[in-house]
Amino acid sequence: MSQVHKTKIVVSPWTVLLLAVFAAMGSPVLLAALLLAALCHELGHYVALRVFGAGVDAVYISAFGAELRLSDRPPLSYGQEILAVAAGPAANLLFSAVLSRCGKQMPELYIFAGAQLVLAFFNLLPVRPLDGGTLVWLLLAWRIDPFAADRGARWIGGIVTAALLLCSLWLLVRSGNPFLLLGVVGLGKSFWAEKGLVKRKETR
C-alpha cells in the first residue's frame, strides 16, 4: 500500500495582516477574485508536480506569493520542472478564458477573469523567485550551464526590477499611489535574497 504524502501549509503573519488591510480598504469581490486566482495558480503547480511524481513537503504562503517545497525524491528533469513552473500561469490563463466566457451571462465574473490574467502576467515577469525568472534560469541552465544561468538570470531580473522601480516612482509622483512602489520593493527584496546555484546540470 502506498503511503499518503502529507503537505504542510505555513502562512506568514504578514499575509494575514495584508489580507485584513486589503479587506478593510478594498472591495470584498476583488479580494475574493485575487484569492481565487492565487488558489488556481498554486493548484496548477501542484497538479503538474503530482503528475510528474514529485512530493510537495510544504507550502509557504507569504505576502508576496507562495513557495512549494519539494521532497528530495524523485528529482525532476529540467523539462519536467519547466512544465511544472509554467503550469501556474497556464492555469490562470485557462481560468481567465473560462471566466471571461461565462462573464457574458454574469458580468461580475469579468473581475475574476481579470484577476486571473493579472496574476498570470505578473508571475511571468523574468525576476526570480517569480515563475518567469525561474523559467529563465531553467532554460539557461538546461541549454548552457547552471552557473552561467545564475549570472544571466540575475542580470535580467535586475534590469527588469530597476525598470519597474522607475515606473512605480513615476506613478507615485503623478498619482500619489504608493501601492505599486510597495509591491516592487517587496519583489526587489525577494530578488536580492535569492540564493545562487542550487542545481547542477549533471544531476539531471
Label the model's feature ranges:
Residues M1-R204:
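Hydrophobic transmembrane alpha-helices and their immediate loop junctions
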